[in-house]
Amino acid sequence: MRKISTFDLYPGMVLGEDVLNFDRQVILSRGTELTDSFISRIELNGVLEVYIEEAAEEVPPPPEGCNADYAPRHPTYADRIKNSPDFKKFKEEYNQITSGFKFKINEMVDKNVEIDTKELLKEPLQLITASGSSSNTLDMLHNMRDYDDLTFAHSMNVALLNYVAAGWLNWSEADKELAMACGLLHDIGKLQISHDVLTKPGKLDNTEYKHIQQHPVFGYKLLKDRVNVHIMNSALMHHERYDGTGYPLQIKGEAIDRFARLTAISDVYDAMTAARCYRGPLCPFRVIEIFEDEGFDKYDVQFILSFLSNVGNTYVRNGCVLSDGREGEIIMLNPGKLSRPVVQCGYEYVDLSKFPDLRIETLK
């Protein structure tokens, strides 16, 4: 049995220890065989690493880009995006900007260099402008998953998502840019976590576990009196949950800074949509379904419904393939079940909310 990053999990692995959330509640039991849904649940609860039985590690993952349940039978929407000139240009600029961001952040932490948020925002804002629209930004991020340093790429993704999501909420341009800055710096505290703790091969003791839980506090202290208060609060509160089940303060509702409430959604969404060794990025409607299954009580309802409905609306009039192999076009969302829209297959209209065993497999 050994510890493995959540990012490296794939279906078929068997848990060697119970998986706990930050309230120390069991979310999956030892001996559970992982499925795509279970992996998403682990990610949704912000768990960074789990223990896997040694025997399970020898099971080879399915081919890259293949879902464990459904092997793609058609060229996907993601394939078209990745092969487009716009994506190739975005990818090149994204990698350059993220590398520059990494250098600047390390200087801020290691050399106590002044934090100039306006300077930090210049290039990410250019990237947003170059993508052309919120839907294009989502498409690019869903497929932009091979940057070497995941910590910094994740922060860049959350920044871009925050900007788009703030626009959906009709926030002012100044607040949209502030939300972007909150995303860029929300995880800066991870740079203060002991390397020995992060790489420890054995089980973490309670002291070490609490040390990891303190990364929001470390981030807050790094940023205190150096940046806007909302940026400080987003570093401190992005793991807080609306129902009070988060950490480190276990505050709830409106006591959580509104920028942190938005950052929490972008943070989890980016983690769930990341490609894995056994599959490409999750279909957006699958991600929406995971949020629905886990419940909305952990997030600001206005923010999460705006976020998910706008993600869904991005793909209305898009082609798709259903899990039974039929091809169709997404016609409209179901407000009460955003993950299950109405799909037109030929002359037939299929309301997925009425067919629990049927889902959108891929976009095309």
Predicted regions and their residues:
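Terminal helices and disordered tails flanking the catalytic cores of nucleotide-processing hydrolases
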Residues: 1-111, 115, 281-364
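Short clusters of hydrophobic/aromatic residues that line enzyme substrate/ligand-binding pockets
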Residues: 19, 198, 204, 242-247, ...
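Short, contiguous strand/loop micro-motifs
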Residues: 24-27, 149, 206, 246
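Acidic/His-rich, divalent-metal-binding segments that scaffold phosphate/diphosphate chemistry
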Residues: 68-210, 224-225
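Alpha-helical scaffolding flanking metal-ion-dependent phosphate/phosphodiester catalytic sites
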Residues: 158, 178-193, 209-305, 313-315, ...
